[in-house]
């Protein structure tokens, strides 16, 4: 269980929103508050041969555009475009350490951690996203394992309704560590 106290302590563990760390893309790690825990939003990307993350579970977000004054602008714009959620009405807790995608294309992604106090109404951009799921944080923590692909075994979160691996796995691993650190404070 993750208490409201831990959420407050999490703000001290995370980096400030202004710390962009040389990133060129941003994602929203959306934590929907519940009484004694939170759920995390995952989206499933549509299958698209030109998308290196085609069909994978992901977090809303994307690349910075020239019109974005900051990566916060990027995550606000991309989350609205993909999910219909207006993040500017929610509380930004901070950012995690940026994560590099691999192998290609190499993108440096800044994960913004955002607390949602209510259930947002989602309107998916069907050109980019197939579906979405909310997953209880405790299920994520308890679901770490390995998954086999044609190219070998990789670490993953094996959830009831999805497998999360790759760059999204790296980001989730960082929030799990941050919550653990906040719990010890």
Feature locations, PLM:
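Unchanged
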Residues: 49, 63-160, 164, 178-185
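Gly/Ser/Thr-rich helix-start
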Residues: 56, 62-63, 167
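N-terminal strand-loop-strand
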Residues: 16-59
């Amino acid at each position: 269980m993750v208490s409201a106290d831990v959420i407050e302590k999490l703000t001290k563990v995370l980096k400030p929103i202004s710390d962009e760390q040389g990133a060129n893309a941003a994602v929203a790690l959306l934590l929907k508050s519940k009484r004694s825990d939170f759920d995390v939003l995952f989206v499933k990307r549509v299958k698209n041969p030109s998308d290196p993350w085609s069909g994978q579970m992901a977090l809303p977000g994307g690349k910075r555009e020239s019109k974005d004054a900051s990566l916060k602008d990027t995550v606000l714009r991309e989350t609205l475009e993909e999910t219909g959620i207006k993040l500017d009405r929610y509380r930004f807790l901070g950012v995690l350490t940026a994560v590099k995608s691999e192998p290609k294309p190499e993108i440096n992604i800044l994960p913004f951690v955002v607390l949602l106090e209510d259930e947002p109404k989602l309107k998916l951009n069907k050109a980019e996203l197939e579906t979405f799921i909310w997953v209880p944080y405790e299920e994520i923590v308890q679901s770490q394992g390995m998954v086999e692909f044609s190219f070998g075994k990789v670490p993953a979160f094996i959830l009831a309704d999805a497998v999360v691996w790759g760059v999204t796995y790296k980001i989730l691993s960082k929030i799990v560590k941050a919550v653990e650190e906040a719990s010890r404070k």
